[in-house]
Swiss-Prot record:
Responsible for the release of ribosomes from messenger RNA at the termination of protein biosynthesis. May increase the efficiency of translation by recycling ribosomes from one round of translation to another. CDD domains: RRF. The keyword Transport does not apply. The lineage of its organism: Bacteria, Pseudomonadati, Pseudomonadota, Alphaproteobacteria, Rickettsiales. It comes from Rickettsia bellii (strain OSU 85-389). SUPFAM superfamilies: Ribosome recycling factor, RRF. Keywords: Cytoplasm, Protein biosynthesis. The keyword Ribonucleoprotein does not apply. GO terms for biological process: cytoplasmic translational termination. Belongs to the RRF family. This is Ribosome-recycling factor.
Length: 186
């Protein structure tokens, strides 16, 4: 592996770690309605388990409601059951075709729990970034040992790897700070 490939590889891995964090943060319920809350819901449909988004259209008509328009009327009850079983704290109400999910206001205690969880996701992502950095530094040592790069070049590249790690770590911090503000806003 050459140094350009190594840097590109590290950057791709760090981007993936950030995408995972972003996905986890989107799943955290804030005071606002978001169709991302239902990403984890799977429905028993046609003899298989399918994501809710493949059997219904999801919309947010206002900040406190999610509407689930089920395409096949015979599946409305199984969609309601799947939402209830998902344990999201949402109570579906249906008129036979459209399912409405009112989003209850978050209590102060629940907001703090969610902020803590967001912080934990951030820490887990930082651990992933540090592991990626460690792997990169080990690869640099191997490259130096195999005489692919010189010792001074090894130190220069190690500094670049650290700089890259710091850059991504600050992106994690800002994402967590933004999510915590979003959660704590009443």
């Amino acid at each position: 592996m050459d140094k350009v490939t190594l840097k590109k590889n590290l950057q791709e891995k760090m981007d993936k770690a950030l995408k995972v964090l972003d996905h986890e943060l989107k799943g955290l319920r804030t005071g606002r309605a978001s169709v991302n809350l239902l990403d984890s819901v799977t429905v028993e449909a046609y003899g298989d388990r399918m994501p809710l988004s493949q059997v219904a259209s999801l919309t947010t008509p206002d900040a406190r409601t999610i509407n689930v328009q089920v395409w096949d009327k015979s599946m409305v009850s199984s969609v309601e059951k799947a939402i209830t079983v998902a344990n999201l704290g949402l109570t579906p109400s249906s008129d036979g075709q459209l399912i409405r999910l009112p989003i209850p206001a978050l209590t102060e205690e629940r907001r703090k729990e969610l902020a803590k969880l967001a912080h934990k996701y951030g820490e887990d992502t930082k651990i992933s970034l540090r592991n990626i950095r460690r792997d990169g530094n080990e690869e640099l040592k191997k490259m130096e040992k195999d005489n692919i790069i010189a010792k001074d070049e090894h130190h220069s590249l190690a500094e670049q790897v650290q700089k890259l790690t710091d850059e991504y770590s600050s992106k994690v911090d800002s994402a967590i700070k933004q999510k915590e503000q979003e959660i704590m806003t009443v």
